[in-house]
Amino acid sequence: MNAPAQLQRALAELLGDARLGVATLPGSELRLWLIDAANMDRAFSPDETRRILEEPPYWCFCWASGLVLARWLAEHPHWVRGKRVLDFGAGSGVAAIAAARAGALEVMACDLDPLALLACQANAALNGVELSYSADFFQETDRFDLIIVADALYDRANLPLLDQFLSRGREALVADSRVRDFRHPLYQRLALLDACTWPDLAEPAEFRQVSLYHAQRS
């Protein structure tokens, strides 16, 4: 199976030897186009490091929080069944795809990065589901039952988004592995679960523990 051409070209511009391949996620039936792990097992040149930092290809990894959220929806489909769902910062689309497979009425993958939206399209096709797509969360109307979010809080400047999620959806389900002092009056932790980014980046153990938070409009 050939990798999506536009995604492969974009990845090769960052890392000349990088290749996309189909990976089955651990503890899941989902398959995604992800970077081949062999490309990560070497030192990067200064130019490669600069390019990665300027345009990080988040979409070619399945981050631990996304994997936790996808597994959670597969195990607890009542969270999305028959609902309109928006996946904020969708990346590879793993959570959006899991929501669609769990019986959501509609799932929108939302990401600022056009390459991420292409990855979502390719991965949706790989898993036999249909998604809709948006590049601007704030252009969407308040019509969603649930906003799902994975690893959007890696930058603490994004914390105000916790309120914005509830401006577009009646509920929010947020998976996060970065914020250790998470406090918000509307969000309650549902679970603390273990997962790793795929391909495995050998992240510190603390980043393999993912908290799942739920909020509902007051």
Place the predicted regions along the sequence by residue.
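A short glycine/serine-rich beta->alpha loop
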Residues: 43, 51-60
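Active-site capping/gating segments
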Residues: 180-218
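N-terminal auxiliary segments of SAM/dcSAM-dependent transferases
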Residues: 1-41
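Active-site segment flanking the S-adenosylmethionine/decSAM binding pocket
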Residues: 132-167
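Conserved SAM-binding loop and adjacent beta-strand
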Residues: 56-74
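Conserved SAM/SAH cofactor-binding pocket of Class I
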Residues: 70-132
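A short helix->loop->beta-strand "cap" motif at the edges of active sites that frequently abuts
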Residues: 104, 168-171
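Conserved beta-strand signature within the Rossmann-like core of class I S-adenosyl-L-methionine
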Residues: 170-180
